């Protein structure tokens, strides 16, 4: 884990201090030699004493214990263990600084513990010391001086060369502690101690040091930064007398407690600050919590030996040190000069120093382990566990992933500052330009994200330096899709040379670089899985393989199309499926046209898109009005059947919003509901051709269903929800007459363009609807045919539109839905001026008899071209543009649910 940025400077100072106090390699080798020589000599002394004791017993017994047979069974092993337990000297252990790896420069005092079967005595100490001198001469040529310290229950060995090391061997026995516990429990001891037994407290201290070493190796050695911080603080305890009482076991416990309770691994600087915070909080104060000793059965305070003044001094010193660290003066706490802000890069050491383990463990005097070794090839293991273990080994054996250009550059030039120069492009496809200054030269590059732009900059810098960019090792062969993707991106940096797309795209797996470029699309800009599904339904994608660790998964998916199998790989199953589908498309449909092959039914011509957004010709745009319904307009290339009227495709039940007169709704060019089986593919494929009058359908200009438009429009009672079905080709040549340049169109619903053109608003149809000024109501269009209430009886908006579902669907509106269907019994008489309204070219009452029922509407209105008003009492009006909804291509809006 990367260290936190705010502690980077502290980390540098702590590590620099640590390097200065860490022993040199020569010192560590001298310690290693002295310890290993002593261990081997003590092993020889143990053997010698054991032989002497066995010599007093029977020879056969000695043979059984000394030379077990080769085909020794577990029973034999148990005998050997028992024989080991009966030895006078049971083993030698490393303790203190040597065992914990806390040696610093100048630490010359080393410690070992010699475990005895019985309580150690002065006689035993003399015997061991005498024979140790003899055995050392056989083990090594180095000269050692051996001293006996009966008061300390120890033997001291000193070397005669530099550095002058001193090794103390403490004699002790577990029996000492066992007897002490019995005494504390109130038991009486039946065995009397020999008169020359060594000091019990010294023996107990040696046993405690053994427990401390084991605990430290189990808890602190594996804790990141813990050993480093302890070494640095040991140096602080030496330099600052106030900290002296903490040196040793209390300091080790304090550091483990402070660092081990953090919720994440910490760098050396942050870990040191956490220890200072722990001390500054008053943990060692008399009323503080103290430091619990985990190696004692009874609750023991490891700092119980400190007096009140020492505790206060340590706390005050820690608080001062913490303030210095907070103000960036940690170097004063460490007793060193401040480091420059930019450290020179040290050459990489081929043999990095392992700061955790200073001296390798001993194998000389190894006691039979209490735990049996793990059997690697044990047959009792379950096959699944074996398989997982093999997979893990294989994963570890795999070479690490090659570094990308950014990582490589950061290794060569650490601390580079990347700057965002600009961000251009639309919101959905931004282009970021990043720059970096290296050795006085500035490099810039762009990309679809800041991360990619930084990567491109790094590639540029490495290429300028003549160094590998890290991309060469990747798969150089890319499919056409990835090539086109890269073409669509801004070409900023010349990437490494890429081999042209191979002929078999199914074998091409995209590199990681292409997956960062964005979504995987076909050359038609679609999702490959979706496009392949349009061509071949019901395909099944199967997972072939899953490799890599949890952080770097690799999936391979396979799909079978027309008997051929195609594979794709990616960092997740979705990406792998996309590449498999892409490979199939490239191979099987290399030249597939953009238009969908699924909808090949014959469609009638469809008008161009209209409305305020797509006004192709000068006409008054309006929501729901649609564009000019001229049948000569070619159909758009890719019409979808369900849509928000105005756009080519959409979702939602045909809200004819701002729609072109093909409506985009259910009646697209005769392929509306007709293509779904609701009605035939006729021009009036609306709701069962609801007003396609057989007689008047094809009249010139204003004929049949909607004057020149010929397309039926069904408007539901939501705003602009019109369903328009464009006209058949036979009307293509018959342009309805109209006034001005307005191409006739007809309203399909919500007319919100009142300000632009309101040929007849509510006031004009005041006799049929409520006077509503500029009401933008539902279906309010021309003259407020806002009654979306054909299925309700809503006289308010439509002048009493009485709609009854009889066999004939008699729509007898006394206002013709007030402009909505502006024909009605003596009601909506209007003149469309240049273009006659609905119905036959000759006036009179026209009854539209659709296949599903006739709308009997007495629409007395003039023929196209005549500017006379309809026979209506109140609401006759003249409109040169005529048009039932601002353009005179009338779509008769029947709003019934």
Curated annotation (Swiss-Prot):
Gene Ontology process terms (BP): defense response to virus; negative regulation of DNA-templated transcription; negative regulation of translation; negative regulation of viral genome replication; positive regulation of DNA-templated transcription; protein methylation; protein phosphorylation; spliceosome-depend formation of circular RNA
Region Disordered, residue ranges: 52-85, 363-401, 466-524, 624-662, 720-897
Main location: nucleus
Basic and acidic residues compositional bias, start-end: 74-85, 372-383, 472-481
Positions bearing the Glycyl lysine isopeptide (Lys-Gly) (interchain with G-Cter in SUMO1) cross-link: 348
Motif extent (Bipartite nuclear localization signal): 371-389
Source organism, top-level taxon: Eukaryota
Domain DZF: 5-378
Keyword set, alphabetical order: Acetylation, Antiviral defense, Cytoplasm, DNA-binding, Isopeptide bond, Methylation, Nucleus, Phosphoprotein, Repeat, RNA-binding, Transcription, Transcription regulation, Ubl conjugation
Biased composition (Acidic residues): 60-73
GO molecular function: DNA binding; DNA-binding transcription factor activity; double-stranded RNA binding; enzyme binding; mRNA 3'-UTR AU-rich region binding; single-stranded RNA binding; virus receptor activity
Cross-link for Glycyl lysine isopeptide (Lys-Gly) (interchain with G-Cter in SUMO2), residue positions: 396, 489
Keyword DNA damage: no
Compartments where found: Nucleus, Nucleolus; Cytoplasm; Nucleus
Interaction with PRMT1: region residues: 609-897
Pfam families linked: dsrm, DZF_C, DZF_N
One GO CC term on file: nucleolus
Residues of the DRBM domain: 398-467, 524-590
Residue numbers of N6-acetyllysine PTMs: 100, 460
Sites of Phosphothreonine modification: 67, 188, 315
Subunit structure: Identified in a IGF2BP1-dependent mRNP granule complex containing untranslated mRNAs. Interacts with FUS and SMN. Interacts (via C-terminus) with PRMT1. Forms a complex with ILF2. Can also bind to PRKDC/XRCC7: this may stabilize the interaction of PRKDC/XRCC7 and the heterodimeric complex of XRCC6/KU70 and XRCC5/KU80. Forms a heteromeric complex with ZNF346 and ILF3. Found in a nuclear export complex with XPO5, ILF3, Ran and double-stranded RNA or double-stranded minihelix VA1 RNA. Found in a nuclear export complex with XPO5, RAN, ILF3, ZNF346 and double-stranded RNA.
General function of this protein: RNA-binding protein that plays an essential role in the biogenesis of circular RNAs (circRNAs) which are produced by back-splicing circularization of pre-mRNAs. Within the nucleus, promotes circRNAs processing by stabilizing the regulatory elements residing in the flanking introns of the circularized exons. Plays thereby a role in the back-splicing of a subset of circRNAs. As a consequence, participates in a wide range of transcriptional and post-transcriptional processes. Binds to poly-U elements and AU-rich elements (AREs) in the 3'-UTR of target mRNAs.
Designated name of the protein: Interleukin enhancer-binding factor 3
